[in-house]
């Protein structure tokens, strides 16, 4: 078990009622959020970043590179939306 508590990942998924977003886009964002949640859970268990990406990729039937792209996108989106708590929690995980 990690020394860090299981963090609440701030939800960056937009409102599904947003008229600018299709149902398909919303489905993708919800899936991406699940990927990030699973990654945080794995990292909090003390699993290495590489192994955590592999586990999450297997669970969601994608490549570990795709998981990494989703994580990068979430970091960029968090910075854009000024969700600094997410970036701080993410950087804490990546340091250990």
Task: Pin down the residues of each PLM region.
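General nucleic-acid-binding
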Residues: 1-23
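Short, Lys/Arg-enriched anionic-surface-contact patches
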Residues: 16-38
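DNA major-groove recognition helix of helix-turn-helix
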Residues: 39, 71, 78
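Short helix-to-turn junction characteristic of helix-turn-helix DNA-binding domains
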Residues: 39-46
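Short alpha-helical "recognition helix" segments of helix-turn-helix
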Residues: 52-61
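Short Lys/Arg-enriched helix C-cap and helix-to-coil transition segments
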Residues: 77-96
């Amino acid at each position: 078990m990690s020394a860090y508590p299981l963090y609440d990942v701030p939800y960056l998924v937009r409102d599904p009622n947003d008229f600018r977003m299709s149902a398909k886009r919303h489905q993708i964002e919800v899936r991406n959020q699940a990927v990030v949640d699973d990654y945080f859970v794995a990292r909090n268990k003390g699993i290495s970043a590489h192994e955590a990406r592999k586990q999450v990729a297997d669970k969601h039937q994608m490549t570990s590179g795709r998981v990494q792209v989703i994580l990068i996108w979430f970091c960029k989106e968090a910075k854009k939306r000024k969700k600094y708590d997410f970036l701080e929690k993410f950087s804490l995980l990546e340091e250990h």
